Amino acid sequence: MPLTTFPHSSHQTAVNTHATTVLRGLQARSKGNPITGKQIGAALGIAGPAVRAIVHRLREQGHPIGSSGQGYWYAGSPTELAPTITHLEQRIRSMAAAADGLRRAFNPQ
């Protein structure tokens, strides 16, 4: 059975259902008053991966959502977003290095 024939997962349903609510909540948060993913999940009855997927989708749509170890917030300036962007770019480089390692696993140079 092709993967495309499976119904939406509960994770995807949670993302679709709660994205607007999460956005409204984050718009009320500043860098000085962040909310954790755990708090968002508890308030909405969803798991951490769904919270992260919602934040990811909102960022893809252009919403300036910053994050740190303290939680998430709606950024008010590019300066507030800079550390989040740097962190995401570091993750990209790390994942690319892992992918390169996997490519070499059966094709050593």
Predicted regions and their residues:
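Short, charged/polar, Gly/Pro-enriched secondary-structure boundary elements
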Residues: 78-84
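Long, low-complexity, charge-rich intrinsically disordered regions
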Residues: 2, 84-109
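Short helix-capping/hinge SLiMs at alpha-helix to coil transitions
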Residues: 26-32, 61
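Short amphipathic alpha-helical interaction segments
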Residues: 46-57
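Short alpha-helical segments that sit at the start of domains
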Residues: 2-23
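A short, conserved structural fragment
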Residues: 59-69
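A short acidic, leucine-rich amphipathic alpha-helix
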Residues: 36-42
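Minor-groove-contacting beta-hairpin "wing" of winged helix-turn-helix DNA-binding domains
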Residues: 68-76
